[in-house]
Amino acid sequence: WGLKGYFTEKTSSGYAIAGRSIPFFAFLLAATAASFSGWTFIGHPGLIWRDGLAYAFASFYVLTIPITGTFFSKRTWLMGKRYGFITPGDMYAYYYNNETLRWLVVATAVLYSIFYSAVQLMAAGALFNVIAGVPTAYGAIFLAFIVWFYVCTGGLKASTWVGVIQFVLLVGGIIILGFFVMRAPEFGGWTAFSNSIKALDPKFLEVPKVINFGLGGGWTSVMILTYMFALMGIQSSPAFTMWTFGIKSPKPLAWQQAFMSTFVVGFALFFFTAFQGMGAKILQLAGHAAFADVNQATVVPVLMKTFLPPFM
């Protein structure tokens, strides 16, 4: 897709926003994958393993991440279509008649991309390390090169079709891994699995009061709420604004916000990431050899290596 985009897109609009031609279905999947990404696959179950169901309530970010898109995305698309904006810097500089804002948007985009990409690459590196035995740094660098290649050569169109595959792997992987963990012989099915969870220390099962540190660690109700509010920035980021500029029509916006993010990803997170995190905690406390030295970054890779069939 990177090479295809390189040979077919000859304008700045074609490269940066796919010529405003991203189709309905592709946007649904790719934008949802971009909203959640590798952190949800690797880090989310890892924090459930570490802090228990107190953190699992943060899965409600499937509601808060699309909220900013609900408020602003359609208006952003209309302005981009009407005035021909290609980047968010174009939009803000024109709207406020101030070129300084263009550079502020660029700085925001660079800082956002550096740290957000670093989280994803760290997750990928941890996965490579456990599954393939490749050092974490080498795995992260290898993935960074692949991303750099298809983004630089193919632009947003290449990123979109890669995002479609990423969505299938993300949601499908979470559900499949959670299912295999729950049905593993070590647990003996749903009844035995739920009984094992009930036997855990209460700090892994209860959410603290509004502000009451200790039980459940730092994940108090207020902490969970502010954490979810912080994630609202994803769909208001400069990168996501360019996704919005790139679609053919605003029709997929509501479907992405209400159905794909909230229902589809929510189904995977509320159930199957909890199965993964709590299952790993049970096995660790039971003295399972594979989970003796796991940490937040390696919980999911170890689960994959232990429970998934070889062909996966």
Residue ranges and their predicted role:
Residues A34-S35, V62-P66, A109-V110, A144-W148, ...:
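Residue-level recognition of pore/gate-forming positions within transmembrane alpha-helices
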Residues W1-F7, I67-R75, A118-G125, F149-L156, ...:
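Structural signature of transmembrane alpha-helix termini at the membrane-water interface
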Residues W1-I42, G154, G173:
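Membrane-interface "cap" regions at the ends of multi-pass membrane proteins
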Residues W1-A16, D51-F57, T87-M91, L111-S117, ...:
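Hydrophobic alpha-helical transmembrane segments
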Residues A56-V151, T226-G233:
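Helix-loop-helix module between adjacent transmembrane segments
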Residues G2, L47-D51, R75-M79, A123-I131, ...:
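Membrane-water interface regions at transmembrane-helix termini and the short interhelical loops
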Residues Y15-A33, M79-I114, K248-K251, W255-V264, ...:
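Transmembrane-helix boundary/entry motifs in multi-pass membrane transporters
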Residues G19-I22, G43-R50, A54-A58, A93, ...:
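Loop-to-helix junctions at membrane interfaces in multi-pass transport proteins
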